[in-house]
């Protein structure tokens, strides 16, 4: 698991369990249940780097859609509505993607 040493398997499993149904994903709840919101800024940056699949320095909409699958290969993709809401919440500068600082603000408001 790519998040070993940052997040516990049990916390990740619990967070994923609570958003199995379509349109049930809430990023604030997920970050709290997975333990991410209580991690250091460096840990949050490390998680961002894992989520930034193409290493562009940003998490784009397509990467957000597959957000849950970064935590478990068997997790579902986010719905279009969930993806757009997640992007809108995190994209504070309106460029259509989430940078590392925006991600940190999203995780630790």
Swiss-Prot record:
Gene3D superfamilies: EF-hand. The keyword Repeat applies. Signal peptide: none annotated. Ca(2+) 2 binds at residues 91, 93, 95, 97, 102. Residues 39-74, 78-109 form the EF-hand domain. Belongs to the parvalbumin family. This is Parvalbumin beta.
